[in-house]
Amino acid sequence: MPIARRSLVVASAAAAALPAWAQPSAAEADAPALPRAGTPLPLAPIDRFDGSRFEPREADGRVLVLYWWASWCPFCALVSPHIEALWRQERGKGLLLLAPSIDREPQAARDYLTRRGYTFPAAWVTPEFQRALPKPRGLPVTIVRGRDGRVRQAEAGQLFPEDVMALARHLQ
């Protein structure tokens, strides 16, 4: 069998053997794409784990970092320490941060935050919040909303520590 044909057969067999779990869930496949820079980003109210309530008007005229995450997400585990560092370093300079968790149960997210000692403002995504502000495709998802209410930056997947810390440039 010629090499090109053999390679095609091997590649086809490998693709057919991919397990179902390697494919995105139906919900993830239907998730919206990341918003484009410059587009308006409407917000929705949500109860934070600390008992306070995030109201969209809090973000008026402020830079907001939205960080969707989950306790079971390995990439979130790599990014979250740097989100915490960003929060600690920049909150006094006007940074607003909201970290909605997509865990199935809010207690899993609360426990994770406690175990890791994270203090960044986090919440659990309720169906109402998801309808108003659907999580874009990917995880983690990090979106920076500028003072004017428009997307300044949107990223899906792991960010390097320097990329997370560079989000502070949007405060200038």
Give the residues covered by each predicted segment.
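N-terminal export signals
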Residues: 2, 7-23
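N-proximal helix/coil linker or "cap" segments that precede and/or mark the start of modular domains
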Residues: 20-43, 111
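A short beta-strand-turn-helix
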Residues: 43-64
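Conserved hydrophobic/aromatic "anchor" residues
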Residues: 44, 68-69, 112, 120
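Short pre-active-site segment immediately N-terminal to redox-active cysteine/selenocysteine motifs
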Residues: 62-64, 69-72, 138
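Structural microenvironment flanking redox-active thiols in thiol-disulfide oxidoreductases
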Residues: 77-116, 126-131
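Short, internal strand/loop/helix patches
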Residues: 112-147
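Thiol-/selenol-based redox modules, centered on thioredoxin-like
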Residues: 147-172
